[in-house]
């Protein structure tokens, strides 16, 4: 007699089921309504088909309301789309169709590429397939059978995929009616469970296996959600994101541009560079009390990168150079043929600075900060404005401390990161601890100690925030050289951006032989903590532009005020107003052109000037100003002195404002 299966339910109850019982059987044993709404099961956290036989462990019944169902909905939608394409265009080959963030795609081999006009036809056919409600059924095929069947269908890409599957691994074939595909699964019970909350978004070209030497395929992107409301919200967010696109706003605001001769590197215009320098100046002030700002070389011999390990595990992302003479005159035996690398990271340089001279435990912690320009190779297709570049500035720091100082340093870093984000208006922050990956350096004892310290720090962060900061664990997601905190912030339209990190490093100090002299006069390896707040300054600026939709806070804006006159009779007074604001430290331009005032206001609104001061005869006579804010129809009239005082306060960076307020409070 077969042994019974023991299942533990989320409420802690334990029940036995006969061997061979499926997930659907378990759901039906609870209620018919649950069985009807169930789309899959999870055994010990692993999502499986509802039709799979259950095994001993902790079971969860997954319904469409479960967040994990979203990946299944999108996965199944990709299969339905592939079937729809082959019904509409027989002879089209299917290749791969994974789930991606917020959706899915499928790559097809088709004689003529898809056009946007094809998408509504495919959507209509998908709805027909969903209405058929064909069950997803799974079969295990032999390698020979799979190759034979797919070859007979003319699916050469599937034959290649079968060959790539390791020997001894099951080949799963999922059927939905007469259509089938090679797939690892899992899937929901039927095509009907996909629902109709989906939309095909765009078509694109893609090389097979991402290799430009291979055939160009035709890719269709789609999105799918649990219900129509979620789909509508997502489409609204996309529309908002398009309006906020920093590349579009960057052109309108005359901040920066890119060009073919420098792919992935920014050409900063005057206004854009002013914002960049404002961010750097702000960060520099925030670090002044606790950090030494250093600067390590951008170009270093590859021998250093071999020692650090970057040349071995990061080489494909690095740029290497040698002298132009050596490259163009290989026959010259006297030429310097050494190969140098543009630094992709600042950390090895900071270790060299720490190592220069003997360090005592009494000097620790030593905190080295740098606004270091780094270069990393990115495929041209992955480049995306300021968000994904090849050359960028990191607000990097490395703390060298004792084991006992690690917790206090991590908390100090956390306080600084959260304070910076708050100054830029970000309130919703998530802090997650990434723990040891399978492949790593350092002993288990070192990892145990570091993870224990960082777990306690995470608990302290959560407790101190009184619920304002969300925390979590990312098992196995740590760097190979140590555990790390990841800081993710949410912007004005709900998108999440991972920016800050705090990483413990067991690797570099050992590789470079870094040490300090401890209280017993022994050489001891320091704990090294990598820390970034903005991460890439360029990317953070892009996030700010999109978060504020170009309506930058006055203290960040490159051009803070435009003084525009209604009549030439007010030009002299307008100049006086502009000079008063400039004397107070604001960035001001004047617009005394012979144009209508509404035209001037519209023009400066397009370039996102936050404050427009309008001066006419009345204002000149009364020594007042008329203030108009970007995005508002309201007008505020006030005296010149009061306006200067008010705008000066608003244009003062928050860190400077806090210091002034604290000084004032102390004096009182």
From Swiss-Prot:
The main enzyme category here is ligase
Keywords assigned by UniProt, alphabetized? Aminoacyl-tRNA synthetase, ATP-binding, Cytoplasm, Ligase, Metal-binding, Nucleotide-binding, Protein biosynthesis, RNA-binding, tRNA-binding, Zinc
Using the UniProt annotation, give all residue ranges assigned to the region (Catalytic).
245-553
SUPFAM superfamilies, per database record: Class II aaRS ABD-related (SSF52954), Class II aaRS and biotin synthetases (SSF55681), TGS-like (SSF81271), ThrRS/AlaRS common domain (SSF55186)
Domain TGS: start-end pairs: 1-64
* Details of cofactor binding: Binds 1 zinc ion per subunit.
Main location (coarse class): cytoplasm
Cofactor(s) of this protein: Zn(2+)
As recorded in UniProt, coiled-coil segments are: none
Catalytic activity field: tRNA(Thr) + L-threonine + ATP = L-threonyl-tRNA(Thr) + AMP + diphosphate + H(+)
Against InterPro entries, the record matches this protein to: aa-tRNA-synt_IIb (IPR002314), aa-tRNA-synth_II (IPR006195), aa-tRNA-synth_II/BPL/LPL (IPR045864), Anticodon-bd (IPR004154), Anticodon-bd_dom_sf (IPR036621), Beta-grasp_dom_sf (IPR012675), TGS (IPR004095), TGS-like (IPR012676)
SMART domains on file: tRNA_SAD
What positions does the entry give for Zn(2+) binding?
A: 347, 398, 530
Compartment list: Cytoplasm
Q: Which PROSITE patterns match?
A: AA_TRNA_LIGASE_II, TGS
- Role this protein plays: Catalyzes the attachment of threonine to tRNA(Thr) in a two-step reaction: L-threonine is first activated by ATP to form Thr-AMP and then transferred to the acceptor end of tRNA(Thr). Also edits incorrectly charged L-seryl-tRNA(Thr).
Which protein family is named in the record?
A: Belongs to the class-II aminoacyl-tRNA synthetase family.
User: Which NCBIfam families does this chain map to?
Assistant: thrS (TIGR00418)
Please identify the protein, giving its name as recorded.
Threonine--tRNA ligase
Please report the organism this UniProt entry assigns to the protein.
Rhizobium etli (strain CIAT 652)
Q: What gene name does this entry carry?
A: thrS
């Amino acid at each position: 007699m077969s042994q019974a299966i023991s299942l533990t339910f989320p409420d802690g109850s334990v029940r036995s089921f006969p061997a061979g019982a499926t997930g659907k059987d378990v759901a039906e044993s609870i209620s018919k309504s649950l069985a009807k709404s169930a789309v899959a099961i999870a055994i010990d956290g692993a999502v499986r088909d509802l039709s799979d036989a259950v095994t001993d462990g902790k079971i969860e019944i997954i319904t469409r309301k479960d967040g994990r169902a979203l990946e299944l909905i999108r996965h199944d939608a990709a299969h339905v789309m592939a079937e729809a394409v082959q019904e509409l265009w027989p002879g089209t080959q299917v290749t791969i169709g994974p789930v991606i963030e917020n959706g899915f795609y499928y790559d097809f081999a088709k004689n003529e590429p898809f056009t946007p006009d094809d998408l509504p036809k495919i959507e209509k056919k998908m709805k027909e397939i969903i209405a058929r409600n064909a069950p997803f059924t799974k079969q295990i095929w032999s390698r020979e059978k799979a190759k034979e069947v797919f070859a007979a269908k003319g699916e050469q890409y599937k034959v290649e995929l079968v060959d790539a599957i390791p020997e001894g691994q099951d080949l799963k074939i999922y059927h939905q009616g007469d259509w089938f595909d090679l797939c690892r699964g899992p899937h929901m019970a039927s095509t009907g469970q996909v629902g109709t909350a989906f939309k095909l978004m765009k078509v694109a070209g893609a090389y097979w296996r991402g290799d430009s030497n291979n055939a160009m395929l035709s890719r269709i992107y789609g999105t799918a959600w649990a219900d129509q409301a979620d789909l509508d919200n997502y489409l609204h967010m996309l529309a908002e994101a398009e309006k906020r696109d920093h590349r579009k706003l960057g052109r309108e605001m005359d901040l920066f541009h890119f060009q073919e001769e420098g792919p992935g590197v920014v050409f900063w215009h005057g206004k854009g560079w002013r914002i960049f320098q404002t961010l750097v100046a702000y960060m520099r002030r925030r670090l002044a009390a606790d950090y030494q700002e250093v600067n390590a070389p951008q170009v270093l011999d590859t021998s250093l990168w071999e020692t650090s390990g970057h040349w071995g595990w990061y080489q494909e992302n690095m740029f290497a150079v040698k002298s132009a003479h050596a490259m163009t005159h290989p026959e010259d035996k006297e030429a310097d043929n050494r190969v140098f690398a543009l630094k992709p990271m600042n950390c090895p340089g900071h270790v060299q600075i720490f190592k220069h001279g003997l360090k005592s435990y009494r000097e620790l912690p030593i905190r080295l900060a740098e606004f270091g320009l780094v270069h990393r190779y990115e495929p041209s297709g992955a480049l995306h404005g300021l968000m994904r570049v090849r050359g960028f500035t990191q607000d990097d720091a490395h703390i060298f401390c004792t084991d006992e100082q690690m917790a206090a340093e991590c908390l100090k870093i956390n306080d600084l990161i959260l304070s910076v984000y708050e100054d830029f208006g970000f309130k919703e922050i998530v802090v997650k601890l990434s723990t040891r990956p399978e492949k790593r350096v350092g002993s288990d004892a070192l990892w145990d100690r570091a993870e224990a310290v960082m777990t306690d720090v995470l608990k302290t962060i959560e407790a101190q925030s009184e619920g304002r900061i969300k925390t979590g664990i990312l098992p196995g997601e740590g760097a190979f050289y140590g555990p790390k905190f990841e800081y993710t912030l949410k912007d004005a339209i709900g998108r999440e951006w991972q920016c800050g990190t705090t990483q413990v490093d067991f690797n570099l100090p050992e590789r470079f032989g870094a040490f300090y002299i401890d209280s017993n006069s022994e050489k001891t390896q320091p704990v090294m903590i990598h820390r970034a707040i903005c991460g890439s300054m360029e990317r953070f600026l892009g996030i700010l532009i999109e978060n504020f939709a170009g309506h930058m806070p006055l203290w960040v804006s490159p051009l803070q005020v435009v003084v525009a006159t209604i009549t030439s009779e007010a030009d002299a007074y307008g100049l006086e107003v502009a000079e008063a604001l400039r004397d107070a430290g604001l960035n001001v331009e004047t617009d005394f052109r012979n144009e209508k005032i509404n035209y001037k206001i519209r023009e400066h609104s397009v370039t996102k000037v936050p404050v427009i001061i309008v001066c006419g005869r009345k204002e000149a006579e009364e020594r007042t100003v008329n203030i108009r804010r970007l995005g508002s129809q309201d007008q505020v009239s006030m005296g010149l002195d009061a306006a200067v005082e008010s705008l000066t306060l608003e244009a003062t960076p928050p860190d400077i404002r806090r210091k002034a307020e604290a000084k004032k409070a102390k004096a009182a």
